[in-house]
């Protein structure tokens, strides 16, 4: 028995959650809702992907459904979350990937259509943040709406947990060198919130705000108030890298830190979530990787035994989407 899943919003994350779900075979996606993409266009958008390549299986329309290999998926085109008839397709676990319904109140609109649980694929101001491999044991079946946090929090949290558990983090600053996303501009345009966010993404390095480091405190309470960070949006289409610069409470050599991260990456708790490499890698080496965080042992440095800079890579699209699928699978097991 598998969780029956619906996806609301067929954008970057919605499509890649579907790819991850089909690949993992641990959940069954039975419905997709997007008011702006018709069925034929869904086939095209799922089949062809500029970052992750052409889908290697069979994608088609059959009997008014989106068919991916042997998976028959009902398609809705409702504007409002409350209007999506999820129960008609048997969908109970809803991935909210529009980027709009990110509060408990807004996400709860899905319950009107028969949803049982909602997983927000973005940070949320008021829902519980649950991260597989970091704080999944905090999930309780009474929780109806949960957030999988952001892709950057998903990269940072496993690394921060390992470092804090082994050496203690007094305080730290995070910088993510982040690929551009759909919120940025192809050419210079207006941006009321932050003017430089409106500059062309493919031509500039754009300093930007991010709450990813602060949100680590939501999944690791002992780090609450100890981390903050910022982003540089750079002209690459996918894959990003986190720089965690932190002060340790317990002195450690860089070799000891590497050993601790390597052990953690091989543990049952973090296997497939945190990986370790000593290869001389670059960003494209991580396209379509399924883990949340890959520690780059060669890239980090230490000023002394208590002040270090640690580097971790992540596919900010597909790696994140794989954790959404893992979270649904874990919730389903706990719920049943």
Curated annotation (Swiss-Prot):
Recorded metabolic or biological pathway in which this protein acts: Carbohydrate degradation; glycolysis; pyruvate from D-glyceraldehyde 3-phosphate: step 1/5
Catalysed reactions, as listed in the record: D-glyceraldehyde 3-phosphate + phosphate + NAD(+) = (2R)-3-phospho-glyceroyl phosphate + NADH + H(+)
Active site: 151
Enzyme type, top EC level: oxidoreductase
Metal-binding found in the keyword field: no
Annotated binding of D-glyceraldehyde 3-phosphate, by residue: 150-152, 181, 210-211, 233
GO BP annotations listed: glucose metabolic process; glycolytic process
Matches recorded under Pfam families: Gp_dh_C (PF02800), Gp_dh_N (PF00044)
Family to which this protein belongs: Belongs to the glyceraldehyde-3-phosphate dehydrogenase family.
Subunit record text: Homotetramer.
NCBIfam families: GAPDH-I
Name of the protein in its database record: Glyceraldehyde-3-phosphate dehydrogenase
């Amino acid at each position: 028995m598998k969780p029956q899943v619906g996806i609301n919003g067929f954008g970057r994350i919605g499509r890649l959650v579907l790819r991850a779900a089909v690949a993992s075979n641990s959940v069954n996606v039975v419905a997709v809702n997007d008011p702006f993409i018709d069925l034929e266009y869904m086939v095209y958008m799922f089949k062809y992907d500029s970052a992750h390549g052409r889908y290697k299986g069979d994608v088609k329309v059959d009997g008014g459904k989106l068919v991916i290999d042997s998976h028959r998926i009902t398609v809705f085109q409702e504007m409002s979350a409350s209007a999506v008839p999820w129960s008609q397709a048997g969908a109970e676990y809803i991935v909210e990937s529009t980027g709009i319904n990110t509060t408990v109140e807004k996400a709860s609109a899905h319950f009107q259509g028969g949803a049982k649980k909602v997983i927000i694929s973005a940070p949320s101001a008021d829902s519980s943040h649950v991260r597989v491999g970091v704080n999944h044991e905090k999930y309780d079946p009474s929780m109806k709406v949960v957030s999988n946090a952001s892709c950057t929090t998903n990269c940072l949290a496993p690394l921060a947990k390992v470092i804090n558990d082994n050496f203690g983090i007094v305080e730290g600053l995070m910088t993510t060198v982040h690929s551009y996303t759909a919120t940025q501009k192809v050419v210079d345009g207006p941006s009321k919130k932050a003017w430089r966010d409106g500059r062309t993404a493919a031509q500039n390095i754009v300093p930007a705000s991010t709450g990813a480091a602060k949100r680590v405190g939501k999944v690791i309470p002992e780090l609450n108030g100890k981390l903050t960070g910022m982003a540089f949006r750079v002209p690459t289409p996918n894959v990003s890298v986190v720089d965690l610069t932190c002060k340790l409470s317990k002195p450690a050599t860089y070799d000891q830190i590497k050993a601790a991260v390597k052990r953690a990456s091989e543990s049952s708790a973090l296997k497939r979530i945190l990986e370790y490499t000593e290869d001389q890698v670059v960003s494209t080496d991580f396209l379509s990787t399924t883990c949340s965080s890959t520690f780059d042992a060669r890239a980090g440095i230490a000023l002394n035994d208590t002040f270090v800079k640690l580097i971790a890579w992540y596919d900010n699209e597909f790696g994140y989407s794989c954790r959404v699928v893992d979270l649904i699978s874990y919730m389903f097991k706990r719920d049943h």
